[in-house]
Amino acid sequence: MSPQIKLYLNPPKNNQYYSNHDHISGSVSVDFGKPVSIKQINVSFKGFIETMTKIDPVVMRNQAALMSPMQDAKTIHTLVNIGQKVFPPENVLSAIEGDLKPFQLKEGVHEYEFQLPKVPKKPKCLSSHTKGLMTYLDKDRVRLPPSFNNDWKNMLRFDNLDLFFYSFGKILYMVEVQIELGKPKSWYRPFEKVLTEIQLVEFIPQSKDLTFKLDDKPSKEVLESFKNSNGEQEEKTSNKLQTEKATVPTNAPLVDVMTQKPDVRVYRSTYKIGLPDDDSVMWLEARSPNLRRTFRGDPIFAGGSGKFDDIYIVMMGDKALIDRLRVIPTRVQLNLLETVTYLSQGVANQNVSSLKLAEDRIPLEKRSTVLKNSWGRYVQFSSSNPNQCKWECELRLKNHPNLKKLKFNEEDYRHRGNRLYSFKSCSIKRIFSFQLLVDWDIVGFKRQSEIIVDPIQVFADRNGRNQEEALPLYVPPPSYTESTQY
């Protein structure tokens, strides 16, 4: 009968998942059914990234070669490998000279405690990266990635192709117990036997170590245009309407910056809506200072949240039409878009999915609390034609009775087995985006505005600045038994 190995891990500090400030510790219990020869027992913490990508044969080959199978691209990166020798004890090892000889242990249960070294911040595979290797890493922000797809075995089902392809990338962390037995005396079994016990663990670094660079800062030209030698805003004359924003040259062309508030970003709707005169247009804007980084439990629509609490409907065109036009919001929906990309040997595969965070129809009696034309104001007039103007009005979703209570990921949802967090690693990139949809009734015509905030950073932990002091862990009281003595 082979030895029975049991691995017991002490819970992490947050009692949910291990982080880079935890010292992974626990005990190993080995039950030997008979006397056995043991050379050493090691406990190690290991981490790996594995990605597999498929190449489209239509792209890589001609039509005549489609019948020939193509090899999948597969890549493995070693993130961490730290360990501790729990047997023989350290004082015995220091006294041994020469090669380590096996020890004879008697039958029964033997227990060994361990505490592994602190988890390093940077992945081990960096030293083995070749020059020109394609990765998703930021050069100045290289950290260990979090666990991803620990339940990948449950996704290998052809009845759901989305999950099947989603399982092609994984980041696994594990605690491994390895027992090296002594060499048997039989001539037909000349090699040592190694027994292993593996337990997967969930590892998520602190939010500061998951932060990656976002290209949402205004350029130097924009910053210089905000101020002159007198500290006043420069004025430019033009026959056309001057916008109150300067476009930021980033990867997201719909991101603007307010000239009056440089820290506020303006996220404009994807498309403009044509108004009944076929000349005037309308669009939606979300103005936020910190919409790009979202922690678990952050309010989304509540006033002062800095997310979707400052939304404006903007019209540009004929003043007479804007004065008499009534635009009615009928429905609001907020989605979280996930984009996961796997990279292997220069080939990338992408998986896209959507999560509905909120959906609510605005009842007729509540519409006046969300949008009123009396809240609107004219912000610009054309110098050549006073009838051409720009008008804006706040869409106060923060007054909506249900939306103002919404907090991001309050229930700690797991999407396809993974908590909600974004990250970049050597060969896996997980990015999220917000998608805000607003349905309109414009003089009987149904229209929809869409704002996409791409990308955003999502964190699994709560914002430390807003997090209240946690209560101590509950410790059950000792149990007592009553006995009567005569």
Swiss-Prot record:
<dbReference type="GO" id="GO:0006897">
    <property type="term" value="P:endocytosis"/>
</dbReference>
<comment type="function">
    <text>May regulate endocytosis by recruiting RSP5 ubiquitin ligase activity to specific plasma membrane proteins in response to extracellular stimuli.</text>
</comment>
<protein>
    <recommendedName>
        <fullName>Arrestin-related trafficking adapter 10</fullName>
    </recommendedName>
</protein>
<dbReference type="Pfam" id="PF00339">
    <property type="entry name" value="Arrestin_N"/>
</dbReference>
<comment type="similarity">
    <text>Belongs to the ART10 family.</text>
</comment>
<dbReference type="InterPro" id="IPR011021">
    <property type="entry name" value="Arrestin-like_N"/>
</dbReference>
<keyword id="KW-0254">Endocytosis</keyword>
<dbReference type="InterPro" id="IPR014752">
    <property type="entry name" value="Arrestin-like_C"/>
</dbReference>
<keyword id="KW-0963">Cytoplasm</keyword>
<dbReference type="GO" id="GO:0005737">
    <property type="term" value="C:cytoplasm"/>
</dbReference>
